[in-house]
């Protein structure tokens, strides 16, 4: 039997794709009576994403604090964007490697479902940038719903049925 979904985590990088995932999560939370947990993983905007979290500490403290406060305000605005929506919600900011922090947060808070955006990168872009969503799907203990921005092409032949020959080869 499936456990009830009472806590939904929505990680956000403040992209349009993450905002679409949040809208899905708000609808789910309303239908299920679940609480929303909006999470942003802070990283130094001047350091490449592949760097270790220790590099993030190199950002001058005043600039780092300003960036965190701006992120906190963005989270608050997204959570309270529509006063007619009736759901419980919290938001938080953590620092570190994005996918790892999302999974750890979900474990620590007893999250039942993660709803997150995915950019759907393929090929070289995927190899160079990796996929936070893919890592979360592979390592999270709870189910993960990935959401693409509307109009995103998923595959050049997505509207055609896939035959077993294509899957097997």
Segments (PLM) and residue ranges:
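Small/aliphatic-rich secondary-structure junction motif
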Residues: 2-58, 150-152, 161-169
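A short acidic, glycine-rich active-site loop
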Residues: 57-73
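Rossmann-fold cofactor-recognition segment
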Residues: 89-91
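Charged docking surfaces used in two-component/phosphorelay signaling
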Residues: 93-101
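Glycine-rich phosphate-binding loop signature in dinucleotide/nucleotide-binding domains
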Residues: 105-111
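Glycine-rich, Arg-bearing micro-motifs that act as flexible, cationic patches
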Residues: 113-135, 153-156
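Short, structured coil segments at secondary-structure junctions
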Residues: 132, 140-141
